[in-house]
Amino acid sequence: MYLVVTRTFPPEVGGMQNLMWGLARSLSKLNLIKVFADYNEGHEEFDKTVSFSIERVSGIKILRKYRKASLINEYLNQNPKVSCIVADHWKSLELIKTNKKKICLIHSKEINHKKGSRLNQKVLNVLNNVDHVIANSNFTKKLAVDIGVEEKKILVINPGVDPIKEIPKNDLKKAEEILNGKKQ
């Protein structure tokens, strides 16, 4: 069983949301998965459509981080069949206490902290204690190495594209309003 730990997941729209959605969908074809994701308005309808379990964590951001970590740590203690944790961000793993295999995705913006700074030390504490670090570009890999991440742990996987079969009508309507609307 795999755990996917993310702060960004559909129905919220965005690049990271799409990436984590595609990753969760693909992993669910290989093994049983459970996703721990931040709460989003309207998630109930979306969550009903997937073939895997999604646990949403709500609350104000600073407390949500601790609450989510507590739920994940408890889940790991009760589910010995979890073999791997895949996280969207180093912060998603910061408070996870386990010796299970961990994989963390990185993007340059989230690790670009001055070498030796408190944030840099937190990043290194997490990333140098995971099994694999997945950088989204060679630029990000170089930056990670420059700030102190162990190069042997880093693999570059460039983001892919998940073409949709049909554009939702409300998105088409919104695009039409923008394109055909009055000039401001």
Annotate each PLM feature.
Residues 86-92:
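Short His-centered aromatic/hydrophobic patch
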Residues 167-182:
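A short helix/loop element that forms part of the nucleotide-sugar donor recognition site in Leloir-type
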Residues 39, 139, 160:
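Carbohydrate-associated surface elements
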Residues 12, 92-94, 102-118, 129-132:
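A short, histidine- and acid-enriched strand-loop-helix "catalytic/donor-clamping" loop
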Residues 70-81:
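Short, well-structured alpha-helical segments in soluble
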Residues 1, 181-184:
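Charged active-site motifs of nucleotide-sugar-dependent glycosyltransferases
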Residues 85-86, 129-137:
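A short beta-strand/loop micro-motif in the catalytic core of glycosyltransferases
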Residues 6-13, 19-64:
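N-terminal strand-loop element at the rim of the active site
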